[in-house]
């Protein structure tokens, strides 16, 4: 057995069909039923997926406030694929501009965060003059800053309460002069004076 063969099989950045880790992860994440629905092959695991434990942090009030403030221009740039996003947020799916949203799991790996191109695609598609980009990672912050540096005015709102170590995330956002820092996205309407 060649080490290079093993490394190739374990490489997460390979396509789903050739990456053992990618395949196992998706089976655990989606569960047996959804995995078969997506890939048209049975899962080796029979349990329900971790996706069933997703906690949706937005609600109708938040979405309504944002849609009113931003003239219906509400899109997402997410590391998830469209299927996972749609499954978890099915209750709110029709509230987003999915045409101008980017689902990075479905895109080439070189477009992964913090590559700014997916964000710029969304900003251009929405014809946005000033974008509010909400995220909970350093990569999100870097994307927003890069978009602004490139002439696409973007205000980053950093959410720190979703982190395993929120105090460290809060400090990182403060050290980088993030203009809006919130513990939870539920605080957003109040922070933007929308309520």
Give, region by region, the residue ranges found by the protein language model.
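Alpha-helix termini
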Residues: 2, 6-13, 66-68, 93-94, ...
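Short, acidic/turn-prone active-site loops that include or flank metal/cofactor-
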Residues: 102-110, 159-165, 186-187
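Short amphipathic alpha-helix with an adjacent loop that forms part of the alpha/beta core around
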Residues: 188-195
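Short acidic-hydrophobic, aromatic-tinged amphipathic segments that line or gate anion-handling sites
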Residues: 179-188
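Catalytic-core regions built around general acid/base machinery
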Residues: 59-71
